[in-house]
């Protein structure tokens, strides 16, 4: 994928064409082999800088084994529908900085449950060539029937009569999450992996730890601590 020049407000028509081209690269297909590691990725903002983090988990023990982060100016200004172009390059770099390449990504955001079928999980999956799942706390598109109250209950998320994900109850009597495949995985597999990595909380453990780690780095940055070795050059 060609890099996007940072800090430049793009031509929206060109950006939309780029998004449509990349969306054609998304492949929803069964996993090739059983993943052994999974990385949660998330981003936070500290002033004008983005904090992009990746936390690698061992899937068998569901324990963190590595983590990395990048601090940089966002690649683009915020443009509705194009969040992945703002955060994706930095999150991808955080994943690349992990000591081991993950077998699977769980992304705090959407996969194909997106107006253009190209959410943040799709962007990262395509750019990195890694199976990716979007696990969002709120719906972006689509309609659904509320799943039953028990953990593991799910219903399809439908957009224009197309199944774009699942509405999944990861904890009994707690609000569901919106799971959608991003790349190289099916809806059913994405649901199974989210349930497998959820341990007593609403969100998967890799996603929770990525959120916590991003908040920690943000707090330290705002307190004036320097991380010059992790900042991307403008």
Swiss-Prot record:
Transmembrane segments: none annotated. Its cofactor is Mg(2+). InterPro entries: Endonuclease-V. One of its GO terms (cellular component) is cytoplasm. CDD domains: Endonuclease_V. Gene3D superfamilies: archaeoglobus fulgidus dsm 4304 superfamily. GO terms for biological process: DNA repair. One of its GO terms (molecular function) is magnesium ion binding. DNA repair enzyme involved in the repair of deaminated bases. Selectively cleaves double-stranded DNA at the second phosphodiester bond 3' to a deoxyinosine leaving behind the intact lesion on the nicked DNA. This is Endonuclease V. The lineage of its organism: Bacteria, Pseudomonadati, Thermodesulfobacteriota, Desulfuromonadia, Geobacterales.
């Amino acid at each position: 994928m060609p890099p996007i020049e940072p800090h430049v407000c793009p031509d929206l028509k060109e950006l939309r064409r780029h998004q449509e081209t990349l969306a054609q690269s998304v492949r929803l297909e069964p996993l090739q082999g059983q993943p052994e590691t999974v990385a949660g990725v998330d981003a936070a903002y500290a002033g004008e800088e983005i904090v992009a983090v990746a936390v690698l988990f061992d899937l068998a023990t569901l324990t963190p084994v590595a983590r990395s982060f990048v601090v940089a100016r966002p690649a683009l200004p915020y443009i509705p529908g194009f969040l992945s172009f703002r955060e994706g390059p930095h999150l991808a770099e955080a994943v690349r900085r992990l000591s081991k390449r993950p077998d699977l990504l769980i992304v705090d955001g959407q996969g194909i449950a997106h107006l253009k079928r190209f959410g943040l999980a799709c962007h990262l999956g395509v750019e990195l060539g890694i199976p990716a799942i979007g696990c969002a706390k709120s719906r972006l598109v689509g309609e659904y029937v509320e799943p039953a109250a028990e953990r593991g209950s799910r219903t399809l998320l439908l957009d224009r009569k197309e199944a774009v994900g699942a509405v999944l109850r990861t904890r009994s009597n707690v609000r569901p999450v919106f799971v959608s495949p991003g790349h190289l995985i099916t809806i059913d597999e994405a649901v199974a992996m989210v349930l497998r990595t959820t341990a007593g909380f609403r969100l998967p453990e890799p996603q929770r730890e990525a959120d916590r780690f991003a908040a920690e780095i943000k707090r330290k940055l705002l307190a004036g601590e320097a991380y010059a070795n992790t900042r991307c050059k403008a």
